[in-house]
């Protein structure tokens, strides 16, 4: 019942609803945890002959444990793809409260502990690949290492007055399976709360424990004790910190809808060489400018005439002629604006002759883009 209850508690914590992005570790991290340790009944073989290492033909009993506690610390490295490697040191403790069967009824008391190290390989499961965007990362892992089992002087007092004591320290190969989940603590990048279940197994002990029997308070014999597999079921809460975790990205900037394009406020009307009359295309452009003046806030319309620097008589005479030509072009555009409904008083005209060319040229050069009138809405 205790095992089922602890498993349910771990599952519920891992499934708690949350909302944010989960952390996949890249780089170094540290991990600490502690919790509940439940040791399965452990089978021991005993011999009263200290020289006889074969236990299979001698007596045997099972030792039963009360619930204890466990703790671990680990340092590791995450590869950014869910895979992690870590080195771990761990400690387990439990009380021994029963031994059976025995030759006579009795009461057993004592405790044992195990400690050592593991190398673990773990994998973090990114839930986003399944369309689940929460700050929880489930993980699974396996580990292997070496554990020492220390049995304190564990005493069995029989109803007939005899006493047996078991004690010693021996080590052996150990392994573990891990399943759990990590929750990203809000506003603390890299820090996670972890909940996990571990099954820690120890296949054998590399040497015997000491078994001493007493009768009427006097040591009667000293022998060996060997233990079979040892299994720990552990339910652990902990904290993990990843050092290279960047803070979460800022929320996306609100989408700014660009304003609707405003009508052009400058219009260009082009002329043939040495001409001031409007072409059909020029009349269309003037009409667009006249219509735009009614849709935007306009206080006045400036009409500026220009020429290129070509002339039949280059020099001052040509410059004077071009100045007059630029004014006539501006007057032609003004007259067309008035026909299109623009009030006369809103129009100012200027002639600049060869000044302010759109396209710089050499002297006495015919350039179509410089033969123009600019309509500017103010």
Curated annotation (Swiss-Prot):
Pfam families: OmpA, Surface_Ag_2
Top-level taxon of the source organism: Bacteria
Signal sequence interval, chain numbering: 1-22
Keyword Transferase annotated: no
InterPro entries the UniProt entry points to: Bact_OuterMem_StrucFunc (IPR050330), Msp4_OMP-like (IPR002566), OMP/PagP_b-brl (IPR011250), OmpA-like (IPR006665), OmpA-like_sf (IPR036737)
Domain OmpA-like: 258-378
Gene3D superfamilies: 2.40.160.20, OmpA-like domain
GO cellular component terms, semicolon-separated: cell outer membrane
Keywords of the record: Cell outer membrane, Lipoprotein, Membrane, Signal
Subcellular location as annotated: Cell outer membrane
Induction: By cellobiose.
Keyword Signal: yes
Function: Growth enhancer.
Protein name: Outer membrane protein
Species for this entry: Gluconacetobacter diazotrophicus (strain ATCC 49037 / DSM 5601 / CCUG 37298 / CIP 103539 / LMG 7603 / PAl5)
Lineage start: Bacteria, Pseudomonadati, Pseudomonadota, Alphaproteobacteria, Acetobacterales
């Amino acid at each position: 019942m205790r095992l089922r209850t602890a498993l349910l508690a771990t599952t519920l914590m891992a499934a708690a609803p949350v909302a944010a992005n989960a952390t996949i570790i890249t780089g170094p991290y540290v991990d600490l945890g502690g919790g509940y340790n439940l040791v399965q009944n452990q089978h021991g073989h005993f011999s009263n002959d200290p020289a006889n290492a074969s236990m299979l033909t001698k007596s045997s009993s099972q030792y039963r444990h009360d619930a204890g506690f466990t703790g671990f610390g680990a340092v590791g490295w995450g590869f950014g793809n869910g895979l992690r490697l870590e080195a771990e040191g761990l400690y387990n403790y439990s009380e021994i409260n029963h031994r059976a069967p025995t030759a006579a009824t009795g009461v057993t008391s004592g405790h044992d502990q195990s400690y050592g190290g593991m190398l673990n390989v773990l994998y973090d499961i990114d839930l986003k690949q399944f369309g689940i965007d929460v700050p929880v990362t489930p993980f699974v892992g396996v580990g292997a290492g070496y554990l020492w089992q220390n049995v304190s002087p564990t005493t069995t007092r029989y109803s007939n007055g005899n006493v047996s004591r078991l004690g010693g320290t021996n080590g052996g190969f150990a392994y573990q399976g891990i399943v759990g989940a990590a929750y990203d603590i809000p506003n603390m990048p890299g820090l996670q709360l972890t909940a996990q279940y571990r099954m820690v197994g120890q296949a054998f002990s590399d040497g015997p424990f000491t078994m001493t029997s007493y009768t009427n308070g006097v040591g009667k014999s000293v022998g060996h004790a060997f233990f079979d597999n040892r299994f720990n079921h552990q339910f652990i809460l902990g904290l993990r910190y990843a050092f290279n975790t960047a803070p979460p990205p800022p929320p996306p900037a609100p989408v700014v809808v660009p304003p609707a394009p405003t009508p052009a406020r400058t219009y260009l009307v082009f002329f043939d060489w040495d001409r001031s009359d409007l072409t059909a295309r020029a009349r269309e452009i003037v009409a667009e400018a006249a219509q735009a003046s009614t849709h935007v806030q306009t206080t006045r319309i400036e009409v500026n005439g220009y020429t290129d620097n070509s002339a039949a008589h280059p020099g001052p005479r040509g410059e004077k002629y071009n100045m007059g030509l630029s004014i006539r072009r501006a007057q032609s555009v003004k007259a067309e604006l008035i026909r299109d409904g623009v009030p006369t008083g809103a129009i100012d005209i200027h002639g600049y002759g060869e000044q302010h060319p759109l396209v710089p040229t050499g002297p006495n050069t015919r350039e179509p883009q410089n033969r123009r009138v600019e309509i500017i809405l103010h």
